[in-house]
Structures are given as C-alpha cells and as structure tokens.
C-alpha cells in the first residue's frame, strides 16, 4: 500500500503524472507475459495493473476477453498467477502492483486467505470489479488487515454520497472511470472530469487515475490536465499483444514504442 504513496510523492516532486498499463497475467503464456511486464516497466510504466484470467469477465470488452482466452489456452491458473506476481515483485521491489479482478476468484480462495496471499507475494492493491461500494465491507476489511489497498471505481455519474464513500473506504488510488460501459480502446475517453476530481480531492480520496478508453498520449495529457494523478491504459496495450501474437520480439518492441510516448505525456 505504501508503494503508491511513495510513487505519488515522487511524481509530484518531478511534476509528472503516473502512466499505468494493464495486462492479463499469463497472456499469451507465462514466459512471454513476464517479458511483457519487464518491457512495460523498462519503457516507463510507473505502476502495474494486472488481471487474473477469469471465465466470465463482465466489465471487459472483447480485447481483454481475448487476452483471458489466450491465458486459458496456455493453461494459466490463479496459482500460477500468484507465482508470477512473486517473481515480478522480486525483480521490481518498488513498483506498485495492483490486481483487477472479479469476486468469484476471491471467494474461491476465501476472502481472508486471498488477501493474505496478496500480501505474501507483494501485491499493493486489489480492485474487485463486480463488487459495488455498498457490498464491499468484507473485502475492504480483509484487504486492510493484510496491508493491501482496496480500490474503488468512481463512475462519471457518481453522486455525492458515493464520492464520500469512495474517499472514505479507498486507499492507494481511485479508479476514475472515463465513461460507463465496457473497456475498450475504440470507445474514446470522454472528458472533462474536473468536477469529480475536485470533489474527490475535497473529500481527501486517494489520488485518481483515469481509465477506460485511454489509448493515445493526448488522452493521458488531458486526464492529467483535468486533475487526475495519471492514466491507466489496458485495451490499447492488450491489442498490441494480440496483433503480434506470433512474433514475440516484435511484440515487445511495439509495446515499448507505445508506452514511451504515453509516459512522456505525463510530464508537464
């Protein structure tokens, strides 16, 4: 959890926002997935948002569903994902690592056991995509017991009550949704979100990172100009993996070419 605080403090000092890529663990296979994550970090990623493959991903558009299917085809299990997380943490001791997942995967393990395992491998935050704030108590309590930040999604139509709850219960960062619907780079982020950012700040919420539909440097810059602490990009990155699925080296080179200008756009 503290890794987010240190990161945001360092970025503030350098007058930069955070660029955070999302990928599915084990896509397109364990070995290449680990190389992808190393490449994203080398190219400038400030933190990681990682998915554990799940059979019924509600909030994901087709791009990320395909990533999940590729990981399944490679035989990737949740247990192997945790082994990967331990390796990533060993290699990159300071980068914040967040998980984006679904409640069933948490229930399968048992809520407390799941967060204990997160703590053990060095995961900093968990966003459970299909658990609304009002049902989050058992998740967020277990998370805090194990020094894992519970992350909440702030939708574009959030009312005052919801903003206060998010500010009160969330730690690490706040996932600021560009728009309603499923993930996907085709659906460009609708800005500005200034009013939400201002309210979150007023209620002392964890720093907002804007996600959903972030696929170009100008969107990263716009998110930061609107007051967000940074931007999360998922579908655009996963699409690059898909496009170069049979050319692992080209894939890594293309990811680097995508991430560098995205990170550059966070510098004011």
UniProtKB/Swiss-Prot annotation:
Pathway: Amino-acid biosynthesis; L-tryptophan biosynthesis; L-tryptophan from chorismate: step 5/5. Signal peptide: none annotated. It catalyses: (1S,2R)-1-C-(indol-3-yl)glycerol 3-phosphate + L-serine = D-glyceraldehyde 3-phosphate + L-tryptophan + H2O. SUPFAM superfamilies: Ribulose-phoshate binding barrel. Gene3D superfamilies: Aldolase class I. One of its GO terms (cellular component) is cytosol. Tetramer of two alpha and two beta chains. The alpha subunit is responsible for the aldol cleavage of indoleglycerol phosphate to indole and glyceraldehyde 3-phosphate. Belongs to the TrpA family. This is Tryptophan synthase alpha chain. The lineage of its organism: Bacteria, Pseudomonadati, Pseudomonadota, Gammaproteobacteria, Enterobacterales. The gene is trpA.
